[in-house]
Amino acid sequence: MAERGRATLAGLGAIGLWALLAPLGVAAGPVPPFLLTGLTFAVGGLLGLSVQLARGQPLSTLLRVPAKAWLLGVGAFFGYHALYFTALQTLPPVDALLIINLWPLLIVLFTGLLPQERLLPGHLLGVACGLAGAAILVLGKAAPEAGTPAPAVIGYLAAIGCALIWSGYSVLNRRLVADVPSTAVTGFCLATALLSLLAHLLLEPAGWPEGSAWLAILALGLGPVGAAFFLWDH
């Protein structure tokens, strides 16, 4: 029970930090999504690296992390945040967050589909209500005029992708790589930073942050894109 209580508190702490992700993302301004993802994860990775070294934990532990854990962790971190910042920059923040934050409902749904698990009527009702609300929002606002490109459509698709990626990661992380230590998150963050910066160089126009945007990026890396992941993995 004590261990479960600590895990619950860690999860609540992570969710509290993630509540800062949107306002800090808005404060960072129109920084290209891949660049913003790369910079924030570089800060988060260096934070984890510093803590690991301060505790005397050898960096060689990262080399023993199985390939499937690397693929799952880096894929989820990279995909979720690139889509998150894309949604936040192309949609009103409230609309984006309403869809993105469907991930807890999807965790309930995906968990119930696993072997030895089952969905109760209350679970299905809650999931249906959440999805119906999101569908009403999308159908009401995301329908563009015929033949007219609509950045908002990209934003809604990005937000839906966020919800699917993070719920899938949360379920699979416990099922497939539960024995991987939390120190692996440091490697995931650093690898995500490198991958995101490479994607920025290849796919995005240059657009460096200015002024107070750097403070927002630092805060993102230390909190929602740093400490939050170590708490969630716990």
Model-derived features: positions:
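Glycine-/small-residue-enriched transmembrane alpha-helix faces in small-molecule transporters
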Residues: 1-44, 144-175, 194-195, 215-216, ...
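Specific transmembrane alpha-helical segments of multi-pass solute transporters/efflux pumps
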Residues: 14-22, 53-100, 136, 221-234
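Cytoplasmic-side transmembrane-helix entry/capping segments in multi-pass membrane proteins
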Residues: 7-11, 64-72, 119-132, 178-189
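Transmembrane alpha-helices of multi-pass small-molecule transport proteins
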Residues: 7, 30-79, 104-110, 164-169, ...
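Hydrophobic transmembrane alpha-helices of multi-pass small-molecule transport proteins
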Residues: 16, 48, 110, 119-142, ...
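Loop-to-transmembrane alpha-helix entry segments
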Residues: 40, 64, 68, 97-100, ...
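Helix-helix packing/entry segments at the starts of transmembrane helices
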Residues: 9, 16, 39, 81, ...
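Hydrophobic/aromatic residues within transmembrane alpha-helices
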Residues: 28, 36, 40, 87, ...
